[in-house]
């Protein structure tokens, strides 16, 4: 689910923290990808006849097709993807998972009614609501990635939290997910629409976390409290508090505790036994992968094993799989060229108070080449 209304709130309150990017701008970047979100995207994708992709045995294979081709697309653009799979959900998420189960049961009833009435639009709509990523989907995608030579990580808990930890540790450049709670976990850069279908022609949205906090004038802890007020997976929220009011209250009072002290509880009651402190703790100190043990390596695809798995077992076209292998190998040859900015380290900006020896035209040169940390161009 992520954080309710956070993307729109950022667009309204801190638009310069968002940039629209083309995939080619991430050449040479290592990016941690929320695997569950990807698989869900692939599973809800349908063919023109309205059916999910299946093999002759009736097994769903759309997750494998999506994982294969979207991964190749990233590799062709010089991106080094690492997929991060969800581990065991935290206990606090049990309430949200229970609600999802109830929504699935309701969707099953509505689907049956739509099928009886022959309403194709509603059949498609409610069928998508019943899509669930299973352990088999996870295992098959892990096998596929291994055969493609692409690394993956099994997170101990939430994938987005481990993605954020990898970014903080400098192992990868960004987190790629559609869920905005990657920012709540503190990822320095969050990318949306990286794994979206090319047919949708969606520009990649790049969120800069440091710039976001600067623009909304909140600390990370205050931002977490804001996200809890907006609505997250771990607990309820105060009734009748919308996004604009939530950020105003955090700016005014600084924390949920102070808000509860000053708000009219008869108009805006908090949930009974509200576990906001526990939710805050999960965002601040999540259970994540030990980044010091992570050694990311991309290798050549195992073409024979890929053909056995994808063609003999899953009945994909052998020509297409072979062609995909050629693209992976070609991308590996191109990826030996690094990003120019990886050869330099910015150690800090020059102090304006410090006098430097001046030569003719030096002021102009400084203006052209000087870099100030934390400044980004507003996306078009």
From Swiss-Prot:
Record family assignment: Belongs to the XPG/RAD2 endonuclease family. FEN1 subfamily.
GO cellular component, one term: nucleoplasm
Positions contributing to Mg(2+) 1 binding: 34, 86, 158, 160
Location of this chain's protein in the cell: Nucleus, Nucleolus; Nucleus, Nucleoplasm; Mitochondrion
Protein name as it appears in the record: Flap endonuclease 1
Pfam families referenced in this protein's UniProt entry, alphabetically: XPG_I, XPG_N
Segments of this protein annotated with the region N-domain: 1-104
Record-listed E.C. numbers: 3.1.-.-
Task of the protein: Structure-specific nuclease with 5'-flap endonuclease and 5'-3' exonuclease activities involved in DNA replication and repair. During DNA replication, cleaves the 5'-overhanging flap structure that is generated by displacement synthesis when DNA polymerase encounters the 5'-end of a downstream Okazaki fragment. It enters the flap from the 5'-end and then tracks to cleave the flap base, leaving a nick for ligation. Also involved in the long patch base excision repair (LP-BER) pathway, by cleaving within the apurinic/apyrimidinic (AP) site-terminated flap.
Region (Disordered): 348-380
Record region (I-domain): 122-253
Region span, Interaction with PCNA: 336-344
